[in-house]
Amino acid sequence: MTSAVYLQAGRDKSLKRKHPWLFSKAIKKIKGKPGLGDTVTIHDSEGKFLATAAYSPHSQIRARVWSFDEKEVIDQHFFERRLRRALEARSQVIEEGGLTGFRLCAAESDFLPGVTIDKFDNVLVCQLLSAGAERHKGEIVGALMAIFPGMSIYERSDVEVRTKEGLEPIKGALWGNEPTAPVLIAENGFKIEVDIIDGHKTGFYLDQRDSRAALERFSKDKTVLNCFSYTGTFSLYALRGGCKHVTNVDVSQPALDTAKRNVEHNNLDLDKVDFVKQDVFKLLRQYREDGVLFDTIVMDPPKFADNKAQLTGACRGYKDINMIAMQILKPGGTLLTFSCSGLMEQNLFQKVVADAALDAGKDLLIMERLNQAADHPIAGSYPEGFYLKGLICKVY
């Protein structure tokens, strides 16, 4: 028998607005003994049905909603319906970009909490971060096999956040053969190498596709500095845009080696590219000391804040790194700067960048705002799905 969760009076407002999370403090009582990932029904204080959800006894988010339809059964057909809808929603962007790599499912933003799925050519990569996603792993794999017959399915749930759900980090093949070599995907006319097994996250940052395309417009006859370059895909767009030279900077030699191969995959001019293994903060200060200047700088750092306690320090980090970047830009140069920290709201990020300009002694013009690509949608009921913020700035 399905366990039932009953809420405190007045704690049902977010669920009535179809937000997918239920926090432990909102719960009054539980009928039954639900285990890790078990399906439960959620009811208001008067017993009225609100949602069907996955129970997570170890997390502050005690339940994540699967459905607000009382009649909907959480089985393989449920996951197949949700995933087919997610694929259909992305059909236009996939066709327009000639994409063989894209995010198929963006977890809560596609109404499947904890379920992230990326498609890289003929391999589907799953990251299952919630107790419910783990519990229904078999049904999720079955749904993917029905939609994408013949494709391999690989799991990259090797992240510490799973421990908050009482789950162990894990990775490995779920169906088909484990990839023995990097996969090549197509993006806006480029061939891009993706390391599914050992790359960051699921292997590649698909969410920055539109931002990479934006760089192409600010590259003609420019010297470009690509900070935190990872596998160098921003530099591909800079090269196609006609840059004089682009410098990729990252602390990972394997990532830089992949960046070099990406230039070769696309028959671009290696003589116009440098690959620098260095800490970005240290190198920027060295450039400032040596008087090295660039026309265009891409500043795409990793997440600086995983929780609210880290937000103040993250603001300092973003301000410091953007300040130095502005100091090594030529007058009228272009800065493309980003934050992937969901806790860093758009207005706060803009203020941090503006403060960096003041500290740098520069005048700042914000020309455009950027965010995550269209295969990373934001559900109207889940504003937390908006996490990637970008600004294109002119600096004088």
Swiss-Prot record:
GO terms for cellular component: cytoplasm. HAMAP family: 23SrRNA_methyltr_I. Residues 2-79 form the PUA domain. It catalyses: cytidine(1962) in 23S rRNA + S-adenosyl-L-methionine = 5-methylcytidine(1962) in 23S rRNA + S-adenosyl-L-homocysteine + H(+). Its main location: cytoplasm. It is found in: Cytoplasm. Its EC number is 2.1.1.191. Pfam families: Methyltrans_SAM (PF10672), PUA_3 (PF17785). Keywords: Cytoplasm, Methyltransferase, RNA-binding, rRNA processing, S-adenosyl-L-methionine, Transferase. The keyword RNA-binding applies. Specifically methylates the cytosine at position 1962 (m5C1962) of 23S rRNA. Belongs to the methyltransferase superfamily. RlmI family. The gene is rlmI. It comes from Pseudoalteromonas translucida (strain TAC 125). It comes from the Bacteria. This is Ribosomal RNA large subunit methyltransferase I. GO terms for molecular function: RNA binding; rRNA (cytosine) methyltransferase activity.
